[in-house]
Amino acid sequence: MCERRIINNFFSALFHDLPEAVTRDIISPVKQATDDLPNIVKKIENEIVNKELVPLMEDFFVQEIIDFTSDEFSNRIKDANGNVVNVSWEELNEKYNEDKFFPIDGKLVRIADHLSALMEADISIKHGITSIHLQNGRDGLLYSYKEDEVVNGINVYNLFYDIVS
């Protein structure tokens, strides 16, 4: 991985939930209640970030923070004009693994986000702190990846089941 990709992945993982500092976390079952709701929530989050967080930031890193928090779970690059372009993991590795493309493994950030939620739920359940919602959340994460599905080179199903067993 090029140096910029490593840096971008780190900061994307670190800042991807920044909008929730203002909007609060909306749990996935609520966000996924309708097909349109995730886009509506994302639009509101972006508006609030621009209104309440951006004015508090130094100008020199505002655009990078927006890059890290926008479309955070998509693999993406910036083209020669600075436009964000979604690309496959294969393209990230074969064509865009150079600093000049500002590459980000957004799907890897998503896996890490799910993994941390799974571990939090699983550890709580194993220590007797549980509820039907926590169990359903844990199970939902386990079932969200197919057995033979590989995301950004990772068999997430196997990873998740290895963690909880």
Mark where each language-model region is.
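Alpha-helical, largely C-terminal catalytic domains
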Residues: M1-S165
